[in-house]
Structure formats: C-alpha cells, structure tokens
C-alpha cells in the first residue's frame, strides 16, 4: 500500500519528518519498506503555456513558442503528436534534470534552435502504468481548469512534492489497505485522533429500487449494496484526484472509474461501477459460474470461467468476475449516462482462488482476500455517489438496494492488566493501558484488574488476549520495555541417565561398523504396523500431503528398508544401517512416544579378500551383533531369550521375539520375501535386522558394571553336532543344553547350521561350541564328559535329537 504523506495530513497534524515517521511506524510492527520523494533528483521543471505551434516541413516536429513566466517566450522544438497552441505543459528549462539524471541543454534540432524540452510524464519519472492513456505516447497537458500558471514549479501541481510511504502490509494488517485505516494506525502511534467523518448524502432523484431485482447468494456475498446515478457526464477526473491515484500506483481513466478507485484507496472497500444499460433485463444475480461460461474482462482478456468463480450476471450472461475485475460488456464508456455502483463483500477464499486461477490479481482482489471492513460498505457507496455528483454532475436516485446485509458484531476480548504485563515483562498501569486502547479507538470496560476491550470491525485481526498484548506492546513501544535477565534455576548441565545411555548405545553400534540413517516419521498405514509384534492404534495426520505419509510410524524398520531400497537402486548392496528415534501410537486414547533402536544388514559380514572367504549376513550374525550390544551395556546374555513369533513383514521361520527376563523388548530376524520381492530395487534380497524398545530396556540396566578377574584355570571346549527336526529352533536346543550342562558351562555358540545333501529330508544339522570353566579349580575331563553325557541325554529325551 502506497500511502501519501500529504494525504495523511488531511486526517492528522503531522509535524514529523516523513523518514522519521516511517522509522517510528516500522518500530510498531507495520514495516515501511521505502519512502519515496517523486521530485527528488529533478530540477528546473516548470509549467509552460504553448503560445503558438507550427509544423516543421518534411518532419513530424513542431516549432513552438512557450510562455514559461519569463520576459520572452522560449522557442522549443517538440516531436509529440499532441502538442498544440493554448496548452499548459511541463517544460524542462536549459540546465534542467529529468528522470535518469538526464540534463537538458539548449541545442539545435534539424538546424532549429531549441531552448528547452516539453515533457511527458514518463520523462520526469512517472511509471508507464500510471500515465493516463491519452498521454501515453505524447506530452502531458494540464487540464484547462488546473490551478497552475506559467513559470511555477510543476512538482506541487503533479503531486511530486509528496512523500510516499510504502506500507509492507502482512495479511493480518489489511485494515491499513485504506487511507482511513492507515490514519488510525499512524494516529495511534503519534497519539492523535484522526479526523474521519461520516458521509452526509442527500438523494435528489426518484426511487429506483423497484426497477432492479437483485438475487444474491449470501454465502458468496454476505453484503451486497447497489446505488444508481443518472445524468452522469463522463470526463477526466479533477487533477487533485488524479494526483492521489497515480501516487498510489493507479492509472486515472475517467471520473466514474477514478471515483471507485479513490474510494477504495480511502476506505479500503473495493467498488465497481456498471453502465446501467447492462441490466436492462431488470435482473442482477450473484452466483457461481457454470461450466463453459466465458467472460471478456476489462483488460480485453477472454477467460473461461470455472464453476468455483463468483460472477455477477444480468440474469443471463456474466458481466463481472466478482471481486477481481469487471467485464468489457458492462464497462463505463464515453457514451454512458446512467451508472450503477456496487459495494460488496465477497467470500475471500473464492476471490483469491479466482484471481490465482486466471492470473489476474488486482487491487480489489488483494483486499478481498485479506479482508475488508464490514462497516465501510455503505459509507463507501455513499461517498462515491457524493463525489460523482460533484465531479460528474450526476443525480443520485433515491434508495440503496441491499440484496444481502449480514451484520457482524464487534468483538469483545477479555483479559487482565496483570496478564498483559506478565507477557510483556512490563509494569504498565491500568490507566496507561486504557489510554493506549483509546488511542487505537478501542472502548474498554474495566473491573479492577479485569478488562473487556470492545474492538471495532475495522480491526478484524484482533480476537484473542494475545492480540491485545501485541497492541499494548507495540503502541507502548518495544524500545520502552525494560531489559531483564531471564530467571533460570542453576543446574549442573549434562544429559539425563536415559540420554547418556542412548548416546552410549549409538556409539556402540557405530563401533560395530553401522552407519546412521534418519528416516521420515510419517509413513503409510500399511507400513506403520509392520515389524511389530502387537501393533497399536495408529496416529493419523489430519491433513496429510499424500497417502504414503498419512500416519506416524510405529517402527523404525520401515525407514531402514526404504533406505536399503534407495541404496540397492544405486548398486550399493553391502549395507549395515541403524536408526535411533521415536515411534508413535494412540493406544488407550492417548498419544504415546517410545524410543527405539533398529539395525538392518545386507550382503556380506565383511569384504572378501585373499585372507578371508566371503560370508553372508544371516540370523546368527545379527544375533551376535545384538548380543555384543547387550553385553556392552550390562545386560547378562543369559537373561535374554529368543522365541519364534509371527511378526507382520518378517520371515515366518527366521524371526524371533526378544525377551529380557521374560519381558518383550523387540524382534530380530529376516525381512519377509513378500516385502523385498514387491520392491523393484530389492528384488528379493535377504535383509536381516533387529528392533528394540529402549524405553523398556534402559530401566532394566543396573548402574555400573562388576569387574570379573581373568580366570586362573584353563577352560575346556567341546563341539557338538546334532541332527534335529526342521521345525525345532536354535533357542529350544540351547535351552535344553543350558538346563543340563551344569554350573561350569560359561559359553555356548552356534558354529554351523546346515541342511541339504547328506541330510535326511525334514532334518537339519546344528553344530555348537561349548566352553566349560571352573574359576576356583582345574576342571577335569571327567566332569566335562559327565556334563556332555547329560546334555546328549536331555536332547534325546526332550527333543528327540541325535548326535551326528
């Protein structure tokens, strides 16, 4: 919003220099992006009167003599097609500076002496977008009734002596998209009440309201007012109005269109004017467009309307895209004599989408989409009628058609003085606070510490106590708030025990050679419940971007499998990844978060070289990695058990649930073939991994670790090769071995698993290494042999297992 400093003076007695005022406004929360002074850099530009004008033979040039208030007229050669005797024009004298810092000097053109230059508006710094069309390709000519005389500076006459404050307005402060709103804002800052009066209008024509039937959908246009003016004389606007329009970045067109734009700039209420002949049908309708309907807009662009566009029709065909731009078939022309004015409020969302859809954002649409003052609708239409009576000799017919007239009651926001002070860290008294609200134009009811603030409709951004805190803070002045140190309790700093353990576990798995992955917390409903023994109620996202990111994850393994797929697609198949993060559920109607740790392996356990043959990752390798992790954090491997369990997304026979002291803490195993085969990149690759719940495990850990001295006596190792049924698991075998081995068994490892040739159908071979140790005495073969006999007998009796 380009705000004129001179126009602000109509409402306020400003004694501050414009740049200083802009700085003060910026400090209160409405940023002033720039301050421009149009005459800056220009000099020796005066009003001149063309005394005579003759064509130069054989050229497009004109030889003129121009009165510039000096003793003798100046001879100036001009090439503009619209120069003529008797015109009041802009003259750049010898030594003048015009736009682009160009210096004007006397010289010869086609051998003819020229002592200056007759200028167009663009040549003295005006943008092409604001120059009236009749002067777009020529010099500017002052209106005949302009209060100017030869020799005077042009700056004041053209509004170039003004200062233009560029309000960089955020969507919540659209109340300042009108001069009255800006005056309220600046008035509150400088502690003045702006002089803003009501419009007193006397109607002098017959009642017209029965001549037009207006059918308006209240949802599309909650307020829709119409007025009619007759006997309108179309002509250029007075120069004072044109100055204000082009300083605000709007091109003057004619007195009717200019009045609607001027009133919009003044009140913030967009308006539109129709040639009354448009509604000879006697009907006006506001509705959504029908598919296939078309409309040629005022910019001569034909658009195919969308069923979501609000349009104004004459009962049959569209004549305006509501809130955006009028139609060419209803425009004001030089032949127009009767005008219908519209002042309305349209649905902001639909207007915004229409403007974007048709790439046609206008001053009106930008205001509608941010919001307009519901109390300005009638004032705006009456003011426009009054101005047209003065500038177009119009007759104002009696009556306003209020097709819709939804009322909006002013908001009352309740809070306390102490709350505002607590938030600001201030000690502002109730009296001073009420004075601040009075400066803003808010009425306050006070009851001790409690206040109820009545907010006028022009400030629709104020609705909650926090808004009042902001208003008090910015008007009081953020610079005036005392600086205080934050009151914080002294702590020793550092991490909690849980955080320390999580960081330690992360360091351990990194030491095992795993690389950290960080995946999305959002996933699909299908993936959310995979890799979990007992899936919980999922946490749904209210407005998901797509179905693949519509719920919160219940496992980390999904992200690691996705990461593996990404790497496999790039020929990186030797993977060892881990992730430590949170998973989420909605069990019991409450939202829960849990810390998990997951790891995923593929390919070989280590790179093949001349010393070592390759070895593929398998269940037992991953289990060994997890056992090492448990041992490193102080969990006795003897307390950890693995039981076969069906888990969605995992292999049915190569997966186990993990228990510590009979409490479920996670799962381990191979990703199901169905999952990897469904992925084009993985193509059925064997992926093994584990996922454990740290929230369950960490409380089980004991503080510190007990040092165990190195054994003084030798250990004895024995290997045991068994032929077992295919359905029997390693855990079952280990349980029997441990229960029969006696107290000297200190380690039990799987050293081989085999099934294939030389093994009976339905059977498989397990080979174990058993370590026996007596820490207090030398262990004898007799004791170990006795233990082995008991183990073999137990295996035969309990599981029908034979020794190979």
UniProtKB/Swiss-Prot annotation:
One of the GO BP terms on file: phenylalanyl-tRNA aminoacylation
Indicate whether tRNA-binding appears among the record's keywords: yes
Work out whether the entry's keyword set contains GTP-binding. no
Q: Which residues form the tRNA-binding domain?
A: 39-155
The record's section on Gene3D superfamilies has: 3.30.56.10, Bira Bifunctional Protein, Domain 2 (3.30.930.10), Ferrodoxin-fold anticodon-binding domain (3.30.70.380), Nucleic acid-binding proteins (2.40.50.140), Phenylalanyl-trna Synthetase, Chain B, domain 3 (3.50.40.10)
Q: Name one GO cellular component term.
A: phenylalanine-tRNA ligase complex
Q: Which GO terms describe its molecular function?
A: ATP binding; catalytic activity, acting on a protein; magnesium ion binding; phenylalanine-tRNA ligase activity; transferase activity; tRNA binding
InterPro entries for this protein: aa-tRNA-synth_II/BPL/LPL, B3/B4_tRNA-bd, DNA-bd_dom_put_sf, Fdx_antiC-bd, Fdx_antiC-bd_sf, NA-bd_OB-fold, Phe-tRNA-ligase_IIc_bsu, Phe-tRNA-ligase_IIc_bsu_bact
- Source organism superkingdom: Bacteria
- The main location class comes to cytoplasm
Segments forming domain FDX-ACB: 711-804
Q: How is the cofactor bound?
A: Binds 2 magnesium ions per tetramer.
Q: Which reaction does it catalyse?
A: tRNA(Phe) + L-phenylalanine + ATP = L-phenylalanyl-tRNA(Phe) + AMP + diphosphate + H(+)
**Alphabetized UniProt keyword annotations:** Aminoacyl-tRNA synthetase, ATP-binding, Cytoplasm, Ligase, Magnesium, Metal-binding, Nucleotide-binding, Protein biosynthesis, RNA-binding, tRNA-binding
Residues binding Mg(2+) are 461, 467, 470-471
Which co-factors does it depend on?
Mg(2+)
**Where, subcellularly, is it found?**
Cytoplasm
What HAMAP family does the database record attribute to this sequence? Phe_tRNA_synth_beta1
Matching entries from NCBIfam families are given as: pheT_bact (TIGR00472), YtpR (NF045760)
Could you give the subunit structure recorded for this chain? Tetramer of two alpha and two beta subunits.
Which family does the record claim for this protein? Belongs to the phenylalanyl-tRNA synthetase beta subunit family. Type 1 subfamily.
UniProt protein name: Phenylalanine--tRNA ligase beta subunit
Organism equals Lactobacillus acidophilus (strain ATCC 700396 / NCK56 / N2 / NCFM)
The gene from which this protein is expressed is pheT
